Amino acid sequence: MRRTFLLLAVLAAGPVQAQDDFDSWLGAFRQDARAQGISPATLDAALSGVVPNERVIELDRRQPEFLQTFSNYLERRVTPAQVARGQAQLEQHAALLDAVEQKYGIPKTVLVAFWGLETRYGAVLGSLNVPTSLATLAWDGRRSGFFRSQLLDALRIIDAGHVSATDMNGSWAGAMGNMQFMPSTFRAYAVDGDGDGRIDVWQSLPDALYSAANYLQQAGWHANEPVAIEVRLPEGFDWRQARVAHRLPVADWKALGVQAADADALPEVAGRAAVVLPQGWQGPAFMVFDNFDVVMKWNRSQNYALAVALLSHQLAGGHALAAREGEAEALSVEQLKALQQALNEMGIDAGTPDGLLGPRTQTAIRVYQALHQLPVDGYPAPSVLAHVEQAHAAAAAAGKLTLAPAPTFAEPSGLP
């Protein structure tokens, strides 16, 4: 944090001072990179004359005003147009996708779903120079260690002859190509799909698709098993059981009355499954499987993993989301901070009021819901905020606000 404040002070002081600070950092970095085997030619091509990109810093620090509901997330990513474009790609690249699926066991609809979500099937690869972006972020200091490592890997990719420094473009964070691989992911999993002796995840679709399939296989993909399916929950369902950490055999969920939303039988899988409620108990419900965890290794967002499942399902001709969306409004970041603060003051540990919906805050919401006989889904719905505000006001009026620990949340039976 101190480094971030210093950076802001430097930028505010003017471009000359900022450039001097950056040049000093860059000189030391070049020496380290050279000591690690990066060639002088690559260092010159990638870093000579480079200046910090203030737009990259702005994007790195950008904070949304509101949380995003699951339905909002899907509305932007799994649309009829996106499905239609994906089905056209399935037809156009059928032979290539068949070959990739045969080698790696990753369904073609899943690969195309990743492709659509990452870059709209190659339409939006990112136009920022990756070495410049990574150098800016490594100098910035907020996550300097991570981005310094990514910059070194980007230089190694250039050094290996896979792409020139000027053609290595991507997102502001350094994600590259059709599947938006970070440099470290490229070096660990990218493969030469077209056999031309170099790996070009930007212009060679075989390289991009083979690389993505290799990643998913190495991440532990389970053949012939879904990522997630929409389900219908029975009347009287114990909402405490709807959490990704609560895994049961599919047969046990069936015995509890859980059914597939499309009336098909629940899939038979070797592992265990969980039920998740991305928009609370009033919204859609999903059963997630081991491949959900694989997708979460690619992107740690549960909404993203569910979007992969839904888009791939629709690409294969399946139905769109069947259930209602739940409470449509999302809390603002400031409202979530207020919710966290109120829970803390009532003795329920929600962590630092930061406006971020992490596991600690979700558990705190569950504790509150259990104490007040509300559906225990851990979701920060506007109705939950209103209930907490009312209870907080009553506790304050009675002089009962406290920071003492609240009763422990009662886990459902059968939790591993």
Residue ranges and their predicted role:
Residues 13-15:
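N-terminal signal peptide c-region/cleavage motif recognized by signal peptidases
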